[in-house]
Amino acid sequence: MNRFDDAGKLLLRLTIGILLLMHGLFKLANGIESITALVQAQGWPAWIAFGVFIGEIIAPSLLIIGVLTRAGALVIVFNMGLAVYLAHSSQILTLTKTGGWALELQGLFLMGALVVALLGAGRFSLGGSHGRMN
């Protein structure tokens, strides 16, 4: 294994975790009415919207500290997939004015979390590289 692998895992975990946590903290401070409306438009109960806090506060926090990292990453993958389905499905094949994919942020969060789920936390984590909670 390359001596920089664990540093790369840490950097990826911190990047995905911190950036997504910022979105969750914004929703915590400003409310989730728009998400509740999206959920109810699907005919689902409004309480499902509170799951955003699991996907954007709890799971990113797990990535940041490196405990239950793979589970937290899979929660983020599910959360982002649901966000694309509920709020962005009409943009899946859309490009921006500058030629980028309209869902590049969601795609980066989803795929970055999937990579974390596959690789684990690494040794720079509370769970340790071979810990049961990695």
Identify the residue ranges that each predicted region occupies:
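Membrane-interface interhelical connector segments
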Residues: 29-46
